[in-house]
């Protein structure tokens, strides 16, 4: 009987150890989608720019003025673009769905120009930049709600293939 108890205790211990080891082996350092992308982004690549710097800034309704958050992102963009001068890029201006097509095209153009002016003031050669406005024609979120509208009021810096 004692022998069977020892065997049973040994089996329990072995089972606990097996579970613990298997859990430890499966415990990868889950970085999440962004962390995994950031660690996989090659420095100086388009993915590096998007993931580690940020390719877009957002605006308040009917505004072209850069917010403190937008300025922080654009400061990082300027540093990155100084380091990787082989890229030319396009600044896309966007607006939410409210307002006329004409109004939103003009607003998107002013937003793109605000970003271009900021980057120029930080030493980025204006010859590397192009601006375009899509107005409300290319929303990233579609719904009749402020949560969607705020995502669509943006300027996106799109890198062109390096030469």
Q: Where in the sequence are the language-model features?
A:
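Short, solvent-exposed beta-strand edge segments and adjacent coil->beta transition regions
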Residues: 54-56, 102, 154
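Extracytoplasmic/secreted proteins, especially bacterial periplasmic and envelope-associated proteins
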Residues: 69, 73-76, 102, 110, ...
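A generic structural micro-feature
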Residues: 147-151
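Periplasmic peptidoglycan-binding/tethering modules of Gram-negative envelope proteins
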Residues: 27-88, 161-163
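Bacterial N-terminal signal peptides that target proteins for export
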Residues: 2-15
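C-terminal motif of bacterial Sec signal peptides marking the signal peptidase cleavage site
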Residues: 21-25
